[in-house]
Amino acid sequence: MSWIERILNKSNITQTRKASIPEGVWTKCDSCGQVLYRAELERNLEVCPKCDHHMRMSARARLHMLLDAGSEVELGSELEPKDILKFRDSKKYKDRISAAQKDTGEKDALVAMKGTLQGMPIVAASFEFAFMGGSMASVVGARFVRAVEQALEDNCPLVCFSSSGGARMQEALMSLMQMAKTSAALAKMQERGLPYISVLTDPTMGGVSASLAMLGDINIAEPKALIGFAGPRVIEQTVREKLPPGFQRSEFLIEKGAIDIIVRRPVMRQTLASILSKLTHQPQPSVVESKADTVAQPENQADV
């Protein structure tokens, strides 16, 4: 074998090894651009270990992070969306539903569960942004109301993680009706004196921000989450003025009094447990180790 053939053979081996690396092993941070090992990022609860950027997280991952292992019982899992209006834009609505269900593994954009948080019974709900932008439609409203009813039945708090672009246009008036429906359900919790904690994540916009997301007894936000009704570009085009830096971000809103506290994801679980123990007049629960307790954080980074 000549020296040229030996070099060519080595090159072919290298190319074969590169091609054998499975997809999805590495990902890039949306903020700093750092290439991250996917498994490490999942252990860090989708928080970049380099710049602390909070990436978007699936609904089930959030609920798994919050609730005690083995305590989760899903609510309203039998509810599925229907194309009652036979709506069509560039695609049929039923085709969009099928594609979203295939991509996410969820039937719709909200997952609700009951369980315990460090031994305290709670009900929790979380939006799935990957399902049609977390848009609120009939099934989302029905599942949220189911979660409220379960909290009323169990006489326990409700926690909701919002991540949504707003009402789902394909369901027209029926999606807008969910704003009133969910707000009316939360009024029953207020009458009973049961705590409702709203956690606003990136992004929380439109009809969701104008209803259930901002009705918490305590409104918590993750760092740098986009929160508002209309998007910044729409507002700039309407008022024809440049918006201030950080407009509609968590840090801007807390300065204006629109939210109560900003909490980093690694300490979200313990913070919620502490708040709920005070609101329900229960003893401070003992700390139960979870994924959130072992997350790496950048140097000089405050927890809350």
Curated annotation (Swiss-Prot):
Zn(2+) binds at C29, C32, C48, C51. Residues 25-294 form the CoA carboxyltransferase N-terminal domain. It is found in: Cytoplasm. Pathway: Lipid metabolism; malonyl-CoA biosynthesis; malonyl-CoA from acetyl-CoA: step 1/1. Keywords: ATP-binding, Cytoplasm, Fatty acid biosynthesis, Fatty acid metabolism, Lipid biosynthesis, Lipid metabolism, Metal-binding, Nucleotide-binding, Transferase, Zinc, Zinc-finger. Binds 1 zinc ion per subunit. GO terms for molecular function: acetyl-CoA carboxylase activity; ATP binding; carboxyl- or carbamoyltransferase activity; zinc ion binding. GO terms for biological process: fatty acid biosynthetic process; malonyl-CoA biosynthetic process. GO terms for cellular component: acetate CoA-transferase complex. Its cofactor is Zn(2+). Its main location: cytoplasm. Its EC number is 2.1.3.15. It is an enzyme of class 2 (transferase). Acetyl-CoA carboxylase is a heterohexamer composed of biotin carboxyl carrier protein (AccB), biotin carboxylase (AccC) and two subunits each of ACCase subunit alpha (AccA) and ACCase subunit beta (AccD). Component of the acetyl coenzyme A carboxylase (ACC) complex. Biotin carboxylase (BC) catalyzes the carboxylation of biotin on its carrier protein (BCCP) and then the CO(2) group is transferred by the transcarboxylase to acetyl-CoA to form malonyl-CoA. This is Acetyl-coenzyme A carboxylase carboxyl transferase subunit beta. It comes from Yersinia pestis bv. Antiqua (strain Nepal516). The lineage of its organism: Bacteria, Pseudomonadati, Pseudomonadota, Gammaproteobacteria, Enterobacterales.
